[in-house]
UniProtKB/Swiss-Prot annotation:
It comes from Caenorhabditis elegans. One of its GO terms (molecular function) is metal ion binding. The gene is mppa-1. The keyword ATP-binding does not apply. PANTHER family: METALLOPROTEASE (PTHR11851), MITOCHONDRIAL-PROCESSING PEPTIDASE SUBUNIT ALPHA (PTHR11851:SF49). Its main location: mitochondrion. This is Mitochondrial-processing peptidase subunit alpha. One of its GO terms (cellular component) is mitochondrion. Residues 1-55 form a transit peptide. Belongs to the peptidase M16 family.
Length: 514
């Protein structure tokens, strides 16, 4: 049977080989700019036809849990759970509790007495697992062989709904988080992580997205009962999406229905593990405030024994939009247009080198070590940032250049530059989704945020429709907000927030000059 099915493909391969042999002499004489004289018998897909290989399905279980899948080829799959959790929901709980939950993942549970047992079960199915918390999402994910989906889902459901914590495991998690908090400032490659955390604190002061993810000092207050209390509020079916890439939908739904039963969760079967009073999850809308966070620090220790100059860092933030906003795609194109990165770009020329942060900042000012734009979007708000690193004596000049980059966008952009930014963004989107774990994360995040799965072709079409007037409109939207400012390192020469606010409000750089 298998042989009969393969005969047509063998014939096709033979025809291709014969065509190549017949045209070999011609091909050797033709320049690379001339197409080979070979017939292409493949039929193009008509416009409006459903894209090949897109078979996403979403099912909502009676308990409110959403299950989504997208089948793919191959022997290995990626499965996992996305939860509306993270530091933005820590109001009322000790700050840092979401990172403690992250470190406690895949420890002992009702079915597994130790972490060793968990990983022994994973090894049986060639499985690897991970748990990562962001500002608004907790992600438990695993990759394994197709035959091991049921066993791996068992591991995931146990670590999410049936964990067993004790004082020893909690203390170990606290030590791990404390070490990371102390280690991050000592690693030059971690500066971007810290700057991102700080600009959120400055932009959304003391609320939701602005709660700190790193460097908090309240972990000593966290008790075992607090962890269970947080899980009982955040790990509810209505706040969760279970996803699988490379699995059959109906069978996967059946597996999830067996393993994800809230009535069997640790805090339901053993209510004594909960504290006497559990705060409600903070569902308030993010409030962009604007603000300033200055960390005047000696960073000389980061350069000792390393080929890095002594740098200071500045971040300018302006109010962006949520991923549900009509301007979300336009903001993404704007970020692609500005682009940026470090002075050395691994991978060689062509990797974003035509973006403005390269052409107008790093290529013209040798003292700028890095410059990059980011668009951080959440369910209800966002912050658009531009970051630069330079020697301390040039840090205010770097801020002036960043503001200038935003101000000049009011004049619009050239058609070729905009087309390049759109093409690069589409390419980035499509190429990333070729990686199975990335496809999984994209799928579960969309179902978690939108309730359904939007295909990348939909976004590609929206990207292509972004015009010059859209760029001008979202630029004006940025400039209408109060700025946020973060300075890190030797920032004595960096202007204050009041001067920056005047420069943005009056569209005039003179307020930033000494």
């Amino acid at each position: 049977m298998l042989l009969r099915k393969s005969i047509p493909y063998i014939k096709i391969c033979r025809d291709i080989s014969a065509s190549v042999r017949n045209n070999k002499e011609i091909a050797q004489k033709l320049p690379l700019s001339v197409p080979l004289p070979m017939e292409n018998n493949s039929k193009s897909i008509e416009k409006g036809c459903p894209p090949m290989g897109r078979n996403s399905r979403v099912t909502r279980l009676p308990n409110g849990l959403k299950v989504c899948t997208e089948d793919t080829y191959g022997d290995f799959v990626t499965v996992g759970v996305a939860i509306e959790s993270g530091c933005r929901y820590e109001n009322g709980f000790p700050f840092g509790i979401s990172r403690i939950v992250e470190k406690l993942a895949y420890n002992s549970s009702e079915s597994f007495s130790s972490r060793d047992e968990v990983f022994a079960k994973l090894e049986e199915n060639s499985g690897i697992v991970d748990c990562q918390s962001t500002r608004d999402t907790m992600m438990y994910a695993a990759s394994c062989h197709r035959d091991g989906v049921d066993s791996v889902i068992h591991v995931l459901s146990d670590t999410i709904w049936k964990p067993i914590f004790d004082e020893q495991s909690l203390e170990q998690a606290k030590l791990t988080v404390s070490y990371e908090n102390q280690d991050l400032p000592n690693r030059i490659e971690a500066i971007e992580i810290l700057l991102t955390d700080w600009i959120h604190q400055a932009a959304f002061q003391n609320n939701t997205i602005g709660y700190p993810k790193f460097g908090n000092n309240s972990m000593d207050k966290i008790r075992v009962s607090d962890v269970y209390g947080f899980l009982s509020r955040a790990h509810t079916p209505q706040r969760m999406v279970v996803g699988g890439v490379g699995v059959g939908h109906d069978e996967f739904v059946s597996i999830i229905s067996r393993h994800f039963d809230l009535n069997k969760s640790t805090w339901t079967t053993q209510p004594t593990v909960l504290p006497a009073k559990i705060p409600e999850i903070d569902e308030s809308r993010a409030q962009y405030t604007g603000g300033e966070l200055r960390l005047d620090t000696d960073l000389t220790k980061l350069t000792i024994g390393k080929p890095y100059p002594l740098l200071s860092h500045v971040v300018l933030g302006l109010e962006g939009c949520s991923y549900k906003d009509e301007d979300f795609v336009a903001f993404c194109v704007l970020q692609s247009l500005l682009g940026g990165g470090g002075a050395f770009s691994a991978g060689g020329p062509g990797k974003g080198m035509y973006a403005r942060m390269y052409t107008e900042l790093m290529n013209r000012h040798h003292w700028i070590y890095s410059a990059i734009a980011h668009n951080h979007s959440y369910s209800d708000s966002g912050v658009f940032t531009v970051t630069a690193s330079s020697p301390p004596e040039n840090i205010n000049d770097a801020l002036i250049l960043l503001v200038h980059q935003i101000l000049q966008l009011q004049q619009g952009v050239e058609p070729t530059e905009l087309a390049r930014a759109r093409t690069q963004l589409r390419s980035h989107l499509m190429m990333n989704l070729e990686v199975r774990p990335v496809l999984f994360e994209d799928m579960v995040r969309q179902v978690l945020g939108h309730g359904d799965r939007k295909q990348p072709e939909e976004y590609a079409e929206k990207i292509e429709k972004v015009t010059n007037s859209d760029i001008i409109r979202v630029t004006e939207r940025l400039l209408a907000s109060k700025p946020s400012l973060v300075g890190y390192g030797d920032i004595k020469k960096l202007k204050d927030l009041r001067s920056l606010d005047q420069a943005v409000a009056k569209r005039d750089l003179k307020y930033l000059f000494n």
